[in-house]
Amino acid sequence: MTIPRRTVLSGGLALSLFASRQVVAAEKVSIGQATPALSFLPLWAARAYQTFGAVGLELNWAAIPGGDPAALAALDAGDIDLAAVGSDTALAAISKGQPFVMVYSLLSKMSLQVVVSGPLLKRTGVTPHDPLVKRIDALKGAIVGVSAVGGTQDRVARWIAAQGGLDPKTGIQVAMVGPPPAIQAALENARIDAFVLSPPESGVAAAGGYGTLLIDPDADFRQLHGLPNLVLVARHDPDAAAAKRIGGAIAAMQQGAAKVIANPNDAADRIQAAFFTRIGQPIMRAAVHSMLDGLTGGGRFSAANIAVLTRFSAESGTPVPDTKDYWTNRFIAS
């Protein structure tokens, strides 16, 4: 039987194209994010600027209901390659023996802020210009809305209460409400007295006329400067393929962070258009600018910022792992 030369050529071409597609097919990396907060800024920027594709990866991103603990549970189950969570929650999990390691600092700054309702201001007579101790004391008995009980917002709220002499367990009431839009609605409708969220949420509440920024931990507590607040967490023992995906994902986020630093307004506009359409441009731009000093160092950990983290964790009641291998820079190429 004679096969026409054209058929052979077309078949060979098809095989060649198929092989080519196999070669260039992007590998998937899965990242779970505990809350849809802007403070995970390098990740938002990497998505907005599509830098995952630039490093040969296809991102499978998931917002995981339940906050930090749920994101870490997904990591433990092998459902995701990386969890984007609060560093204190990661430390607590590692201290309990879970096989995790912090691999990248998404934001080396305490970005969470305490915003309170108008009724609370009226009831207590406190103002944002009062001494810090008086502002903290105004939170006594307040209902503070968070995305997840036991998560970073919860821990920070209780730590702040303790700094003013309140009992961190009973001095405030912490209520799980949900993601930021639900928390905003709860404050606006007087179902909670306060929330602990990152920008742009303080700007949103102020623009809506129902919330006032009362405590800004980064400004009010100098001991928190440099804190690696939000981190990427991986399993402690990734195989070679997973390690390559992790390194590539970090490179993509470094590129995203570099874009933010180079042109904050452009980054804010892109992120807003893609993911935060409910936020006005001036508020979004101000929020991005407020986080720029948390993007230094290329996401690397240092002895200095780990010391800040361990001190904060000890003060907030978070156990610190006995071992010293709960963080690493080995996946960061440059």
Predicted regions and their residues:
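C-terminal segment of N-terminal export signals and the immediately downstream linker at the start
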Residues: 1, 19-32
